[in-house]
Amino acid sequence: MTEVFTIKQCLDGEISIDETVTVRGWVKTRRDSKAGLSFISLHDGSCFSPIQIVATDQLSNYHKEVTKLTAGCSMIATGKLVASQGKGQFFEIQAESIEVVGWVENPDTYPIQAKRHTLEFLREVAHLRPRTNTISAVTRVRHSLAQAIHRFYHEQGFFWVHTPIITASDCEGAGEMFRVSTLDLLNIPKNDKGQIDFSKDFFGRETFLTVSGQLNVEAYCMAMSKVYTFGPTFRAENSNTSRHLAEFWMIEPEIAFANLEDICKLSQSMLRYLCKTVLEERADDMDFFNQFVAPGCIERMEHIADSEFEIMTYTDAVKALEASDQKFEFPVSWGLDLQSEHERYLAEVLCKKPVIVTNYPQEIKGFYMRLNDDGKTVAAMDVLAPGIGEIIGGSQREERLEILDRRMDECNLNKEHYQWYRDLRRYGTVPHAGFGLGFERLISYVTGVSNVRDVIPFPRTPGHADY
């Protein structure tokens, strides 16, 4: 039996010319010549480019099946791998047999025709959109970035911790969470005060889908020293923007005996590593994005890979923004959060490279961030990248119980819900720090695909959970 190869193996020159190979995949296009030849463009997802299958009318099923192949049909082809006579390709397969595995019913109504489709349309056929050039390229880049993240942290001595999806804690303190419940909605139990009695629920208390793995991974940081979590998180924000998803993935490292400077260095090393990796491993896909989606994205990745990031305090950033001649839509003032236009000005105009802004006012940051000695700012950091603005957010955590309790009171958080988190400060507390990187935000930045709904397989947004 002839060995089965991927199209990537065939096109990468791993196989000798004139060797008989078998490939499997889906038809992109088919064109016929008057000389009794059919040229079939076949893809299998292993690389960006399809391979051309040349079929002659000498095949036993040529007239009955081969000439009826349309976009989306699945097939298995066996034949000799030869140097291609056509332009734009180095190799093709001279078919000795073609087996049609699956036909497309009603080819005229098949959604993924051989033409360019808008990303908005493709979201309506999310189960078929991986067959397009853009989404398949995004998927391969996503894979390479995910593998690179695990490799980077493994090489740095980190342990991957699988934090829970179901939680009783709100890391962000924002309250925009998805509730998890098995209570009968038609017969909800009530307590003496007329409130929902969550003691009758599955977990015996109110529970939610996690908004972040940070609090849980901090617990393992206090025993394993260097850990990270990489998994799905959920936000019940009713936001219909190109930057928001209800379900998305986060990378969250946490380091014991560490301060703000340590995570600034780690974030820079990680981003540089990821940019280098994607340029090396996904050159064909990045060429596509650079040519058709976001011209200049390769140069942008090269720039980040080779740059030393600028570091400035929030106070200095505000002063620089106030001193600029730029007219901003949103006001700039100490104590207000930086908006995307401010972040991009700092990275693109002022510094012309990635910027790490540190030491933000405590009022605009999370309760768990370490209060600085000035009593006004916390040891927080945001990494701002040219072309997108904030891409990473992190901080040194508050390891002093009395100050953590005070911050929780100021944020009106119920300490009973965070008792285990407070225990970490009571039993062998140490300075520690970490950050979060939204995975879809990273993929969007790398590929230039501007809407995060197009860089996750099945996007979850307000009013949309169809697949």
Swiss-Prot record:
The entry's keywords: Aminoacyl-tRNA synthetase, ATP-binding, Cytoplasm, Ligase, Nucleotide-binding, Protein biosynthesis
Main location, first listed in the record: cytoplasm
PROSITE patterns tied to this protein: AA_TRNA_LIGASE_II
GO function term, MF aspect, one: nucleic acid binding
Top enzyme category: ligase
Reaction(s) this enzyme catalyzes, per UniProt: tRNA(Asn) + L-asparagine + ATP = L-asparaginyl-tRNA(Asn) + AMP + diphosphate + H(+)
Stored InterPro entries: Aa-tRNA-synt_II, aa-tRNA-synth_II, aa-tRNA-synth_II/BPL/LPL, Asn-tRNA-ligase, Asp/Asn-tRNA-synth_IIb, NA-bd_OB-fold, NA-bd_OB_tRNA
GO biological process entries: asparaginyl-tRNA aminoacylation
Intracellular or extracellular location(s): Cytoplasm
Subunit-level organization: Homodimer.
Name of this protein: Asparagine--tRNA ligase
Origin species: Legionella pneumophila (strain Paris)
